[in-house]
Amino acid sequence: ASIWLCGVAVLLVYAAVSYVHIRRKVRESVRIEGNIYICDRIQTPFIFGVLNPRIYLPSSLKEVQIKNVVAHEKAHIRRLDYLWKPLGYVLFAVYWFNPFCWLAYILFCRDIEMACDERVIKDWSAEQKKEYSLVLLSFHVSGKMITVCPLAFGEVGVKQRVKGILNFKKPTFWLIAAELLFCVI
């Protein structure tokens, strides 16, 4: 029990330290409109905050990228991902000893991003999807440790996300109806 408790403590302390570190980084950010802030000290856009989620954009962001990034981050807010991801991390911290929990948390983070991408691009043209994919690739973050709270634009499974974006087809009415019928049965 003490080893398990130490593991939980380490993961929760890591979360707290990460939170404080990010909070310090965005302290000097400038509000540009609504809940959107620009910051010189970050390299990738993300959402931060649980009670009052804010979108933080790096100052290096080009004007053509802003539209896609803000659409993506606003989709996270509408989906309440800023609440789900920390909750998932707490579950991960409690069940850290189970290797399937590590896998589940990684897949959970990937699925959050892919669901958000689908929500953003569902009515877009092929050209808009291509532009979105290029922006996503420009923010790809490689070799990162498991993150706690921020929902970063290029955080997880970029190759798979880009494939999903470029091959996305809106499901037909009949497919959705069949899936609902299957669930009822």
Predicted regions and their residues:
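Membrane-embedded and juxtamembrane structural elements of multi-pass membrane proteins
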Residues: 1-185
